Amino acid sequence: MESSPESLQPLEHGVAAGPASGTGSSQEGLQETRLAAGDGPGVWAAETSGGNGLGAAAARRSLPDSASPAGSPEVPGPCSSSAGLDLKDSGLESPAAAEAPLRGQYKVTASPETAVAGVGHELGTAGDAGARPDLAGTCQAELTAAGSEEPSSAGGLSSSCSDPSPPGESPSLDSLESFSNLHSFPSSCEFNSEEGAENRVPEEEEGAAVLPGAVPLCKEEEGEETAQVLAASKERFPGQSVYHIKWIQWKEENTPIITQNENGPCPLLAILNVLLLAWKVKLPPMMEIITAEQLMEYLGDYMLDAKPKEISEIQRLNYEQNMSDAMAILHKLQTGLDVNVRFTGVRVFEYTPECIVFDLLDIPLYHGWLVDPQIDDIVKAVGNCSYNQLVEKIISCKQSDNSELVSEGFVAEQFLNNTATQLTYHGLCELTSTVQEGELCVFFRNNHFSTMTKYKGQLYLLVTDQGFLTEEKVVWESLHNVDGDGNFCDSEFHLRPPSDPETVYKGQQDQIDQDYLMALSLQQEQQSQEINWEQIPEGISDLELAKKLQEEEDRRASQYYQEQEQAAAAAAAASTQAQQGQPAQASPSSGRQSGNSERKRKEPREKDKEKEKEKNSCVIL
């Protein structure tokens, strides 16, 4: 169906307005007749009733009140076979008529029933039923003509910007394809993009008119949708974690990494940092903080984009099952995964649903908790058990009557105790030889997931502690021993130079020195109070040991009481000296000479008294 610019009726504030008086063409009478007959012209209805302030300009292009459909009586009977006016025939074709429809608008067919309903009831957005045409009184020819021009569904939202939904289908935002982050949440503004408008032009009739000078009415709507998404995310994840972003120069590229504010497992950060360093996931420039939900959405987007294109039917079904399992445990990435290592290889784990995430993302997962194959008794005791199986074996062996099983349980328990750091030198050697040069992977140790890489034959762990957020020279930490005392390096794996003393905060350094001295004094005091067990003979009886302990306790008590008496004597001497000094200060200024002579006589007496008090307060040990 085609229409002229004069027949446009913007639905603003719920009232359909027609062209202004005096602006009608020579065929205005024909338009009024067809409006009265129920053959409404095609009009463009905005998606929002409020608009952006330009609706008044469009409202001024209105028909006289007598020509308005609201004022036209409903004429029952058959409708006109003419679908509308032809712009080419009427000579009213304008350059704007050939343009594509504006974003935020779609074409509807106005009928007298719709116009009358719009007068009494406020029309909502384009998705409301009030803005939809009532085709009950139209003929089959008009239904056919209007069917090719109707929008897809109420609201007009789709998960794809360039592929609008076909007519009659209702796209769902809850589908798997709409799993996007907050910055790319599909809104009506993105759905009605220029690319989508170009794709929709061939579907509509040529010469379709648009509002000249109109502006898309989707900015306010997009802000409202974003606010709704943020409110929904807060309800879904109350008290969610917020992470700070550190920007580094990684291979001459300004690359972000996610830092961790609390010490915990959080495999989500390790996985996202691998994807960020590989430039498979990109964040907005100079972004400083990000929420856990946003990280999950970025990860979900990447998992959907990484779906293989050409696979067989069996592989597709297997991939979909793995994707479903991964989505089910995706929320665990914020707190921790159930990873069960085996002590036979750096990439050998007991298969759990949590491992599917690493398989789908194609991120290697390593550990270094291996048994040295040269120690036969440990190899026999541990065998091919995983960590959980080994713990169960130790418990069962301890309760067994077989001495050999008890011995194996004891050896296995000793192995776990001696390798509490969950990294052995044999495992470190295997890691160094297995990890490829420049490979980005995840390293599991002590229930913690770290981003790891290999540079010139040396393993490095990414430093994600938030305390180093502003330290540009601290990016990687070398992994060259099992004690965890690696060296800090910058983004180019250069050792961190020592800090300039002038740049060190003096107050902070003084506090560190005081804390160190306090700890040292406490350590010395504790060592002085401890009993030297090496000096006690091995054959001593319990009675003699008790006597020695009692003597040590008596010595400590006497030392404590001596310190208390000395402190009390010093306090008494100080108070006496203060009382004697007050009369001397209260002497009149007129008798300065006599006062000075008296003070000179009193000074040796006071010194003698203090010496006598010190002698009396001394305790002979």
UniProtKB/Swiss-Prot annotation:
Biased composition annotated in UniProt, kind: Low complexity: 145-163, 558-591
Query: In this UniProt entry, which residues are annotated as the site Ubiquitin-binding?
Result: 542, 545-546, 549
Q: What is this protein called?
A: Ubiquitin carboxyl-terminal hydrolase MINDY-2
Family in the record: Belongs to the MINDY deubiquitinase family. FAM63 subfamily.
Q: Where's the active site on this chain?
A: 266 (nucleophile), 448 (proton acceptor)
* EC top class, as a word: hydrolase
Which gene is the coding source of this polypeptide chain?
MINDY2
Q: Domain of life here?
A: Eukaryota
* Start-end of Basic and acidic residues biased regions: 597-621
A GO BP entry: proteolysis
The answer, when asked if Transport is one of the entry's keywords, is no
Phosphoserine modification sites are: 94
Q: Where is this region: Disordered?
A: 1-106, 119-179, 556-621
Q: Which UniProt keywords apply?
A: Hydrolase, Phosphoprotein, Protease, Thiol protease, Ubl conjugation pathway
> Which source organism?
Homo sapiens (Human)
**Which purpose does this protein serve, as stated in its record?**
Hydrolase that can remove 'Lys-48'-linked conjugated ubiquitin from proteins. Binds to polyubiquitin chains of different linkage types, including 'Lys-6', 'Lys-11', 'Lys-29', 'Lys-33', 'Lys-48' and 'Lys-63'. May play a regulatory role at the level of protein turnover.
Q: Where is this region: Ubiquitin-binding domain (UBD)?
A: 507-559
The record's catalysed reaction(s) read: Thiol-dependent hydrolysis of ester, thioester, amide, peptide and isopeptide bonds formed by the C-terminal Gly of ubiquitin (a 76-residue protein attached to proteins as an intracellular targeting signal)
Task: State any GO CC term.
Answer: nucleoplasm
Give one GO molecular function term.
Answer: K63-linked polyubiquitin modification-dependent protein binding
